[in-house]
């Protein structure tokens, strides 16, 4: 069985769409659950980091009971690290959301059975692009085959 945890390298969204098209419905559901769990963890992490940032910037003096100890032990030198972490987490969240959308599109496509999945349509559109050029070489002058006549 395949899982998001088994991926050894970052995978681009197009590769992800291709990979999920060959998976079972159960695998799609499992991967979606794993991604949604990761999204929840990142959102909680960003909320906590947001509190740290607000505390360091002096914008938030309100402390919740469970956060007061953690917020008292933060160092002002950590501000840049916290901001970078939030920014990186947002990028990962966007990537995860793209994957959830792709999983939902694949599921809808499988349930409706109508037409082609969005990924298949996009892939076909990319292969059909290009200039319409006459590739027929039957009119080539044998004496000067590499010449261009204007």
Swiss-Prot record:
Induction context: Expression is increased in absence of RPN14 and upon treatment with tunicamycin, an agent which causes accumulation of misfolded proteins in the endoplasmic reticulum.
A Gene Ontology molecular function term of the record: enzyme activator activity
Disordered: annotated span: 110-139
UniProt xrefs under InterPro entries: TMA17
Modified-residue entries (Phosphoserine), positions: 24, 68
Disulfide bonds: none
GO cellular component: cytoplasm; fatty acid synthase complex; nucleus
Biased composition (Basic and acidic residues): 118-127
Keyword terms, alphabetized: Chaperone, Cytoplasm, Nucleus, Phosphoprotein
Record localization: Cytoplasm; Nucleus
Function, as annotated: ATPase-dedicated chaperone that assists the formation of the RPT6-RPT3 ATPase pair, an early step in proteasome assembly. Plays a key role in maintaining homeostatic proteasome levels and adjusting proteasome assembly when demands increase, such as during proteasome stresses. Function overlaps with RPN14.
Assembly and interaction partners: Interacts with RPT6. Interacts with the 40S and 60S ribosomal subunits.
Protein name stated in the entry: Translation machinery-associated protein 17
Organism: Saccharomyces cerevisiae (strain ATCC 204508 / S288c) (Baker's yeast)
Taxonomic lineage of the native organism: Eukaryota, Fungi, Dikarya, Ascomycota, Saccharomycotina
């Amino acid at each position: 069985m395949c899982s998001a945890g088994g991926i050894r390298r970052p995978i681009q969204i197009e590769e992800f769409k291709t990979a999920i098209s060959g998976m079972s419905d159960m695998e799609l559901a499992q991967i979606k659950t794993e991604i949604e769990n990761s999204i929840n963890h990142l959102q909680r992490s960003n909320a906590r980091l947001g509190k740290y940032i607000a505390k360091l910037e002096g914008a938030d003096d309100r402390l919740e009971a469970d956060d007061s100890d953690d917020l008292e032990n933060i160092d002002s030198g950590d501000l840049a690290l916290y901001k970078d972490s939030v920014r990186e987490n947002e990028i990962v969240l966007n990537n995860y959301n793209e994957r959830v959308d792709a999983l939902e599109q694949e599921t809808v496509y499988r349930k409706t059975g109508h037409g082609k999945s969005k990924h298949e349509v996009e892939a076909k559109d990319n292969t059909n692009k290009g200039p319409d050029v006459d590739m027929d070489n039957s009119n080539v002058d044998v004496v000067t085959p590499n010449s261009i006549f204007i």
